[in-house]
Every structure is written in structure tokens, then in C-alpha cells.
Amino acid sequence: MSITTLAVPGVRGLTPYQPGKPIGELEREFALKRIVKLASNENPLGASPKVLEVVRRILGGTHLYPDGSGFELKAALAEKLGVEPAQIVLGNGSNDVLDLVARAFLTAGRNAVYSEYAFAVYPIATQTAGATGKTAPAHDGSRGPRFGHDLETMLERVDPDTRVVFIANPNNPTGTLLGRGELYSFLAALPEHVIAVVDEAYFEYARRPDHPDALEWLGEFPGLIVTRTFSKAYGLAGLRVGYAVTGVEIADLLNRARQPFNVNTLGLAAAAAALEDTGFLEATVQANDAGRSQLEAGFRERGFDFIPSAGNFVSFDLGRPATPVFDALLREGVIVRPLGNYGLPNHLRVSVGTAEEIDLFFAALDRVLVP
């Protein structure tokens, strides 16, 4: 008997999440001196100087457990977002919060619905909870933006056993964005037995006229959960801080399932400081707009189709299997993200970096594509 047969079926059938290749691993493998990492949608500006100052100040207290309630961070978030602290659930990154939702609402005999090309954590959280994942095909371009969520088809996938619908807006890895009217209509059409999770990890980057702020609808939809993170625009990916905002009753349920001390001392303090530095956030968004335009212009110049993005990354179609190009870029010291695991074997996703990093990426791409 294989020891793996003792595990629950949902875990046995999982494909592990593949993070971006670490810089240290590439240094060891190829003995490279200069490495450009554009794989994990991190903030190329780093973290706010105010955050770094706070972290240095509290390093001497790391032998103490953190505030398990996250009181100060929840108070700061509540004030900024116009909600009550009791509506907020803190997590070890927003992935932790997504997993909490699955553990609270999914089990064997229930299912979750999400879109094709949706964030890979949704099926992981769903299957680990023993539930079934139902994938709705994305738009093919005939009725909506290609690669975007087809909300009509997602709604058709909902049945009496559906308990959760996951929607990323903007979506990762495609960068596609749902407009205010279409997302509202979808939420209004969901039956009462379905929890709607709107994953807004890239919210701060998506400054489009029709971009919805799902927090505005919390009072109207009791089953709505909005998740956000400090890993992207706030530059705290290494400290792992995310959160959910929802109704008080759902927040209470999620907090019952939450592990004690799931957010560390440094993360709590850093996130609170990051919220205060609005100037750094604005600089981040402006730099991202410029970098995203630089990427799109480079792809356009080289004749590559790309998916217009509202996030801090752009995915493009090589027109050939992407893995060999990905491997060749690694040898050049450039780390990007292949999307074969998302069903896009010809695509690479490139995070927005500094202007210099983007130039280095395109120079490396040109070298590896020379016949």
C-alpha cells in the first residue's frame, strides 16, 4: 500500500502551486551575477521607507507573540475603508483568507465555481476542503474580452450544491477586468446559498473609469466577501499580510477557523505603516502605469499578441511553446512566469519592473529568439 492513499482524495488529486523561481536558486544553478526577477508581481520600488523604519524599530520584540486579534491594523483598515473592525479578517497573505473561506463553507458534496484562467489557489483551496471545483470557460472574444470571466457561463455553473464563487478582479494571470455594471448584475443574480468572493489583490493598480470597488456592495449582498493584500502595491510580499472585508456574521465564522497568530508582528506593524504612506502608494501606481505601457509597447513592436492588463503584469503569446523560451531566459538571468499550468502553454507572464529591468528583459528575449 502506498502511504499516499491515506491522504484525503482532494489532496491526492492536487497539482502543487508553482511559485516564481527564487533568485537564490538561479544564482546557484547558473552562477549569474545579475538577475532580473519579473515572475511574481512584486513591487519593483520595494516597500515604503516608513515601513522599513517601523520594522527596524520593532525587531527587538520578535521573541513575543504578535497581537492575535490584529487590533491596530484592523482599526487602521476600518478607518481607511469605512467599515467596522468586526467586518475584517486578517490573513497570512490573502491566500490564507481564501483558504479560510474554503474551510468555512466547502466540504464533500459541495462545489465552488471559478473561471478558466483564474488564480491557481482557488482549486487548491476547494479540493483541499474536499469539495469539487467547477470551471467556467473564459470569454473566447465573441461576447466579451478574450480571456476574461464569462459571468453568464459562471452563473450557469451554479447549482444547489454550490457554496462559493471565486472572482478575481483584476484577474491573475490574464489581467482582465470586469466592469462595475456586469459584476454588480452577477452578484445580484446569485442565489442566497452562494458566497461570492471578489478577490481584489490588484485593486490598487486598476484605476479605470468603470472599475468597481466591491466594498460598496457589502450592505446589499450579505454573502459577499472582498479580499485584498499588502503583497502587491504595498510591497510587503515577504511579510505575508492580507485581509477580507465582509459582513459581521461571515467575519465571525472565518475568525473561528483562523489559526492563532496567523499574522506576524512585523507584518502587522508594516501593513499599518504602509496604509499611512499614501505618497508611496501613488508613486507605485504611477510607476506601474509607465512600466505596463513600456511592456505593451515592446510586445507591440515585436509583433506579439498580449492581453491588455489592469494589474502589474502583462501576459503575452509567443506563438510557440513557451517553456523553452522560459528556460532560455533563465540562462540569461531573467525570471518570468510560464502559464502552461493555467492552460496557456504559449504564454509568458511578465511582471512590471523598473524601466531598466524591462529593457533587460526585452534584450534577453531578443537574444533567445534569434533563429
Swiss-Prot record:
Lineage: Bacteria, Pseudomonadati, Pseudomonadota, Gammaproteobacteria, Methylococcales
Annotated PROSITE patterns: AA_TRANSFER_CLASS_2 (PS00599)
Pathway assignment: Amino-acid biosynthesis; L-histidine biosynthesis; L-histidine from 5-phospho-alpha-D-ribose 1-diphosphate: step 7/9
CDD domains according to UniProt: AAT_like (cd00609)
Keyword Transferase listed: yes
GO biological process: L-histidine biosynthetic process
NCBIfam families: hisC
UniProt-listed Enzyme Commission number(s): 2.6.1.9
PTM annotation (N6-(pyridoxal phosphate)lysine): residues: 232
Organism from which the protein derives: Methylococcus capsulatus (strain ATCC 33009 / NCIMB 11132 / Bath)
Subunit structure of this chain's protein: Homodimer.
Protein name, as recorded: Histidinol-phosphate aminotransferase 2
An example Gene Ontology molecular-function term: pyridoxal phosphate binding
